[in-house]
């Protein structure tokens, strides 16, 4: 465990994670300073009186005088103020690094462009089904520092590329990069390989690396080695097996579960299940209880979630599809009896939308594009696209045209922040309108 006594500590970013960092240091007899670029950041009213704070920007004087900066994942290491501090020799970490220095139980670490939250939650459910005292969080749910507990037997963490950039002490018992597709390109000026390099940090010092056999970008830089276990649709140690119209999860040649016993549906969710099973096996969770968890897990909100089924029309809320790869996963292998009414739009974060084009063929699909990058998305196939300012306008436009057998799918391929507070609010608005219009 690290010693922070007599250290001048500055925390950048409040909110729940920032407050967890403040509590962490106060519990160790260190009073940090806190700064936030927002004028009234969430959690400001919960800061103890003795903690100095600076809001509405960064305080370069504090940063340069610090021994340790704990930076929120929301601020880029390339920010001039952080670059100057780093050049002056100030150590810069994130909350995950603080956590890794303290955690005594094994850690399962999960990253990737898509599916992270589902796989993280699934592995957590597998551990609970086995009676293991598990802490689940990180980039979802509770901040990692709030999970620390001497009685924990296992930690399961979802980690973003931003969190991994400031983490060097992670020694995961099992780690995975589920997939790598363009996301956050506004934070990675050198492109996909720079983003990938941040993700691959999860494998450093890991005992077992769970890689995606269908995505070469998930392999460690030096290639697969004896630490690697693979999952995939048709290839890998953990893969899908299709026979006589049935689909099975298969492990090293052995059928272990028929997918019809799972509550989750869709090929992308079946591969998420394989990844979760590989991680659970890697840390010694009993196979029987892991498979039991797969049969009871109903999925997460806003992730290909059935919002309404009425008059033969299914309205699907996949608002968590905040990047192109996530929407590709939703469309890959999707079966619709009638017409697919696809809602796309929001803030594309400088992404290339062209990989979506191959899923937008045929005469049984209509596009409704909205938000900041609606025009770019409509340009993928203009003859079947209609562009509106807002998602609500798009839904009111399509509603009179849906027929039994159709599907209305919100899988926007974009972030929501141009028009919504977050992807959850976007999904809630979709669900409310589906119930009104359906």
Swiss-Prot record:
Keyword Nucleotide-binding among UniProt keywords? yes
- Can you tell me which residues bind ATP? 112-118
Q: Which GO terms describe its cellular component?
A: cytoplasm
Q: Which UniProt keywords apply?
A: ATP-binding, Cell cycle, Cell division, Cell shape, Cell wall biogenesis/degradation, Cytoplasm, Ligase, Nucleotide-binding, Peptidoglycan synthesis
A molecular function annotated in GO for this UniProt entry is: UDP-N-acetylmuramoylalanine-D-glutamate ligase activity
Q: Name one GO biological process term.
A: regulation of cell shape
Q: Which domain of life is it from?
A: Bacteria
Pathway as given in its UniProt record: Cell wall biogenesis; peptidoglycan biosynthesis
Q: Where is it localised?
A: Cytoplasm
Indicate where this protein is primarily found.
cytoplasm
User: Which residues form each disulfide bond in the chain?
Assistant: none
| Annotated InterPro entries | Mur-like_cat_sf (IPR036565), Mur_ligase_C (IPR004101), Mur_ligase_C_dom_sf (IPR036615), Mur_ligase_cen (IPR013221), MurD (IPR005762)
Q: Which Gene3D superfamilies match?
A: Mur ligase, C-terminal domain, Mur-like, catalytic domain, NAD(P)-binding Rossmann-like Domain
Swiss-Prot/TrEMBL catalytic activity: UDP-N-acetyl-alpha-D-muramoyl-L-alanine + D-glutamate + ATP = UDP-N-acetyl-alpha-D-muramoyl-L-alanyl-D-glutamate + ADP + phosphate + H(+)
Q: What is its EC number?
A: 6.3.2.9
One Pfam family assigned to this protein is MurD-like_N
Q: What does this protein's UniProt record list under function? A: Cell wall formation. Catalyzes the addition of glutamate to the nucleotide precursor UDP-N-acetylmuramoyl-L-alanine (UMA).
Record family assignment: Belongs to the MurCDEF family.
Q: What is this protein called?
A: UDP-N-acetylmuramoylalanine--D-glutamate ligase
What is the source species? Salmonella typhi
Q: What gene makes this protein?
A: murD
């Amino acid at each position: 465990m690290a010693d922070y006594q007599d250290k001048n500590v500055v925390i950048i970013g409040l909110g729940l994670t920032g407050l967890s960092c403040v509590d962490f240091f106060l519990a160790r007899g260190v009073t940090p300073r806190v700064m936030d670029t927002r004028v009234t950041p969430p959690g400001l009213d919960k800061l103890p009186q003795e903690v100095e704070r600076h809001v509405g920007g960064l305080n370069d004087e504090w940063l340069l005088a610090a021994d340790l900066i704990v930076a929120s994942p929301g601020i880029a290491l390339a920010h001039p103020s952080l670059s100057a501090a780093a050049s002056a020799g100030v150590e810069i970490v994130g909350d995950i690094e603080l956590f890794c220095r303290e955690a005594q139980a094994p850690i399962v670490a999960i990253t990737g462009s898509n599916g992270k939250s589902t796989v993280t939650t699934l592995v957590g459910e597998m551990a609970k089904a086995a009676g293991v005292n598990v802490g689940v969080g990180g980039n979802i749910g509770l901040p990692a520092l709030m999970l620390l507990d001497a009685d924990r037997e296992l930690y399961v963490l979802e980690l973003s590329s931003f969190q991994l950039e400031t983490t060097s002490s992670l020694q995961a018992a099992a780690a995975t990069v589920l997939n790598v597709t363009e996301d956050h390109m506004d934070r990675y000026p050198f492109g996909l390989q720079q983003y990938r390099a941040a993700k691959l940090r999860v494998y450093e010092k890991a005992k077992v690396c769970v890689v995606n056999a269908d995505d070469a970008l998930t392999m460690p830089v030096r290639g697969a080695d004896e630490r690697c276990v693979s999952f995939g649709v048709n290839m890998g140690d953990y893969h899908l097996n299709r026979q006589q119209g049935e689909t099975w999860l298969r492990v090293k040649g052995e059928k272990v579960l028929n997918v019809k016993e799972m509550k989750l549906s869709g090929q992308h969710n079946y591969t998420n299940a394989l990844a979760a099973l590989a991680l659970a096996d890697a840390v010694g969770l009993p196979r029987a209880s892991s498979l039991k968890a797969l049969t009871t897990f109903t999925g997460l909100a806003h992730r290909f979630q059935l919002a309404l089924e009425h008059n033969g029309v299914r309205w699907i809320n996949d608002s968590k599809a905040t990047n192109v790869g996530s929407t590709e996963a939703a469309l890959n292998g999707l079966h619709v009896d009638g017409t697919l009414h696809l809602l796309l739009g929001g803030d594309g974060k400088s992404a290339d939308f062209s990989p979506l084009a191959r899923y937008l063929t045929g005469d049984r699909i209509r596009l409704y594009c909205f938000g900041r990058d609606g025009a770019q998305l409509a340009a993928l196939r203009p003859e079947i696209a209609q562009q509106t300012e807002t998602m609500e306008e798009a839904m009111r436009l399509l509603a009179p045209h849906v027929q039994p057998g159709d599907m209305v799918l919100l899988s926007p391929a974009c972030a929501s922040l141009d028009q919504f507070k977050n992807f959850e609010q976007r999904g809630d608005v979709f669900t409310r309108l589906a119930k009104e219009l359906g």
